Design a protein with these regions (language model features):
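Gly/Ser/Thr-rich active-site loops/lids in small-molecule metabolic enzymes
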Residues: 152-154, 192-194, 200-223
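ATP/NTP phosphate-donor binding region
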Residues: 1-69, 76, 80-81, 87
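Short acidic/glycine-rich loop or secondary-structure boundary segments that cap or lie
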Residues: 144-147, 177-179, 191-195, 219-223
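ATP/nucleoside-binding phosphotransfer catalytic cores, i.e., glycine-rich phosphate-binding loops
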Residues: 171-173, 203, 213-290
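Catalytic core of DAGKc-family lipid kinases
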Residues: 8, 16-19, 42, 84-185
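A generic structural signal for short beta-strands and their flanking turns/coil linkers
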Residues: 163-167, 180-182, 205-210, 248-252
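Cofactor-binding loop segments of dinucleotide-utilizing enzymes, especially the Rossmann-like FAD-
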Residues: 11-14, 96, 214-216, 288
Length: 290
């Protein structure tokens, strides 16, 4: 059952990724359903957002699935371009590598099969709005020296290089007593960066964010706490209960005397004040058929 008039595959690369285009074209041809599809090679995630938003404005009457073919930053950008576009415009994810955080949220679902994408079902998901930017999965502060292309690497040397921040965090209007903060994660989904399992209990359709604040502590202990955070086991280890604060919230405000950097699904946002809130049922995502 074809649910959309057109599929637009969005990826990064000015000259195009020949292997991606060939793989998509081959799979769509094998489906033999006469599906209308096209490609857009975005220069970067911000250009992808602008293109998707403009496309929605110019083609209001064409039901379109915008398929993000890339990592978290590109996926969030495509989703951001769909804000306010209406039910006829839907987000899809093509993730043959299995590293996309949004795809990893749906355990057991095959986001590498276009046949299952075409037969999939759209479902509403929330997004996080931070100031004027959006995230699908998570916002993270404090991992600048600890994240590589494979996700979190909380080695002792990385911990020693990182600085602690005096940050004021307000959750649904109530200030948290957090003291000096090493990092915090604000999650809509379960993963950040494709590998950081920061919020194993989070739901991306419940109208709330999962906040975890890691306090300042001796480096050796901090390294252990971060390993537990990365593997999604922090809440299961009573010995670490006093090392972090966890809340579920509709809104979170962050203030700092000096500029800090938030990572919004891999896109940096720099400032001293941030206002984050959940946007319920912000976009629809095609969940692949089983």
């Amino acid at each position: 059952m074809i649910r959309f008039t057109r599929y637009l595959f969005v990826y990064e690369g000015e000259d195009g990724d020949a292997r991606l285009r060939d793989s998509v074209s081959r799979q769509m041809k094998d489906l033999d359903k006469g599906i209308d599809y096209d490609f857009h090679a975005a220069a970067d995630p911000e250009e992808a957002l602008r293109h998707v938003s403009l496309y929605c404005d110019l083609h209001k009457d064409i039901d379109t699935c915008f398929v993000a073919c890339g990592g978290d930053a590109l996926t969030a950008a495509v989703a951001g371009g769909l804000m306010g576009a209406g039910e006829g415009k839907t987000l899809g994810v093509y993730d043959p590598s299995g590293t996309n955080s949004l795809a990893k949220y749906y355990e057991g679902m095959d986001f590498g099969s276009l046949a299952k994408l075409v037969d999939g079902t759209p479902a509403p998901i929330d997004m996080i709005r931070v100031n004027n930017s959006y995230a699908v999965n998570a916002c993270v502060m404090g991992l600048e020296s600890m994240v590589d292309g494979k996700g979190l690497t909380p080695s002792l040397s990385a911990v020693l290089k990182s600085s602690f921040r005096s940050v004021k965090i307000t959750v649904d209007g109530v200030a948290l007593d957090t003291g000096s903060v090493f990092l915090f994660t604000l999650a809509n989904g379960k993963y950040a960066g494709g590998g950081l399992h920061c919020a194993p209990l989070a739901l991306n359709n419940d109208g709330k964010m999962d906040l975890c604040v890691i306090r300042n502590m001796p480096p050796a202990r901090l390294s252990k706490v971060l390993h537990a955070l990365a593997s999604g086991t922090l809440a299961d280890e009573p010995a670490f209960a006093g090392d972090y604060t966890a809340r579920r919230a509709k809104s979170v405000e962050v203030e700092c005397a000096k500029d800090i950097t938030l990572s919004l699904d891999g896109r940096p946002l720099i400032g001293k004040e941030f206002k984050a809130r959940v946007v319920p049922s912000a976009v629809r995502l095609v969940v692949p058929a089983e």
